[in-house]
């Protein structure tokens, strides 16, 4: 189980990340002036039913804005205009070489004593990259208020991960705001991180709706829940901005998708074990799965996430033999790069790399991701984007062109039209 370490950091155990063993391993054999400020809405209690979901979030083309900052509800969130730094969307012609999209995403999005959220904001900023940070809702809930969380099929206040310290909540709020201003996406990793028995894979559509409603509420009401009255509001309206998420342990996508329709979400990143092919929609929502990548030195493939490399290297321990760290670091980095090169020189299908903010095996998985960002994001034709930005681009394309791209094998070389 997860716990609080001696330095007060929130720890995520292997058990909290892992799903069933068959999913965990997931290795298969295969080849100007200051704006005016107004207040909108009344303060809502975190225990009341949240307001009705917003309509479908609009794609990136910026809506008009009157320059006024609107503080929402109890002051936890605000509308500060269209998100800065969003890329222009261009429509492909038939046969035209598409960009090579790469999406780096992070499950949890907590700034704790390891300062990994701020580290990867900096990595993104310095390498022309945008990323998706999936916030776990209870990371904005103090431990003293844990019973505000009413998890499906569990007692109030129960969670499979630790609640944060007050200091970590304040640091996380800062990181969320700055990440959004820099053009990154804030998605959701839901709340309690329950897996397997009584986890998301066993939840009904209504139970998923409850989990989603609470994820919204924890963002909309953190000032009321924490008492951090002097902390500025988040610079976005989560009701309009939230476009998708990733379920803990990649469980329960079928009922999650049925629930997500009510919220106008654009994508879901909760499926697993698919080859590197151009995305399709499930139930009207873009499906962005973790992918199978060539494992270095083996005739097998591995899911594109830190945990799955760990499972192949040190099994069920996050503190393996330090003498093997350099080899494991190279394996992980080369695995991601193998997947990149296969599609960059082939079908140009988007590459999805998922991770947690963790220090497993001496931090080698964080270093591997940083190395890959620095290696690929400035290469010709590469766009390191968020999931929402990718959904914007896909929605702007001719469906016939996308269908042609889906017929390509990942490594299939093509003579693209200029």
Over which residues does each language-model region extend?
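N-terminal export and membrane-targeting signals
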Residues: 1-18
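C-terminal region of N-terminal signal peptides and the immediate post-cleavage residues
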Residues: 3-4, 24-49
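Hydrophobic membrane-insertion alpha-helices, especially the h-region
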Residues: 14-28
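Ser/Thr-rich, Proline-interspersed low-complexity disordered segments
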Residues: 41-64
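Active-site-adjacent pocket scaffolds in enzyme catalytic domains
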Residues: 63-72, 150-166, 231-347, 398-409
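C-terminal domain-boundary segment and adjacent tail
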Residues: 78-81, 132, 267-280, 334-418
